[in-house]
């Protein structure tokens, strides 16, 4: 399991955790020097586990789908909670021996924001926010769980996908911050960027369809080819366009 302990967390240990998370995901080669995730995998390798420990030493284990870096479920050790619409094999393979429950929402942002009654841009990130999220999930407070899961997903999966998000969180070891429109636009466009970067391989580096992002100054930017910084320095994992 990949592990991250908040009680001794530093900017450096968080970056190491994200590096270890990226490395734990099986790859299908690289495109423009960016690792591509698998499009299919045998059940026994479908999920990886990450252990997260809060300031008080309470821990949860989250299960991540290696095909898309989605969190599908988490466990407190005795009880496990699965999102709706997870891969059918997830409950058979994960957290056996726990009391398995299904959360009242799927893991997508729209559903979680509706359940949280808040948009992501109004939910604070940073390692203190992750500590609170782990506490909420450990004790399972139904009302607060959706917000906590939004923090968890962005601090793990999204940081693994994008170096920019990783660095924003690494720079907030002792503080909380609300995600910028830059972060939100990256999260919303990971699939689109992944697809266009893979298409560009056969189009001399050109995207078939531009991807619109928001830069740190708040401007809309059209990404049209693989020379963009988002491709050369930011995105760290690509969703395989062969994955269904």
Swiss-Prot record:
One of its GO terms (biological process) is negative regulation of translation. It catalyses: Endohydrolysis of the N-glycosidic bond at one specific adenosine on the 28S rRNA. InterPro entries: Ribosome-inact_prot_sf, Ribosome_inactivat_1/2, Ribosome_inactivat_prot, Ribosome_inactivat_prot_CS, Ribosome_inactivat_prot_sub1, Ribosome_inactivat_prot_sub2. The N-linked glycan consists of GlcNAc2Man3Xyl. Transmembrane segments: none annotated. It holds the Pfam family RIP. GO terms for molecular function: rRNA N-glycosylase activity; toxin activity. Glycans are attached at residues 189, 225. The active site is at residues 70, 109, 158, 161. It comes from the Eukaryota. Its EC number is 3.2.2.22. Keywords: Glycoprotein, Hydrolase, Plant defense, Protein synthesis inhibitor, Toxin. It is an enzyme of class 3 (hydrolase). Has cytotoxic activity towards cancer cells, but not normal cells. Inhibits the growth of the human leukemia cell line K562, the murine melanoma cell line B16 and the lung adenocarcinoma cell line A549 with IC(50) values of 88.1 nM, 63.4 nM and 359.3 nM respectively. Belongs to the ribosome-inactivating protein family. Type 1 RIP subfamily. This is Ribosome-inactivating protein cucurmosin. It comes from Cucurbita moschata (Winter crookneck squash).
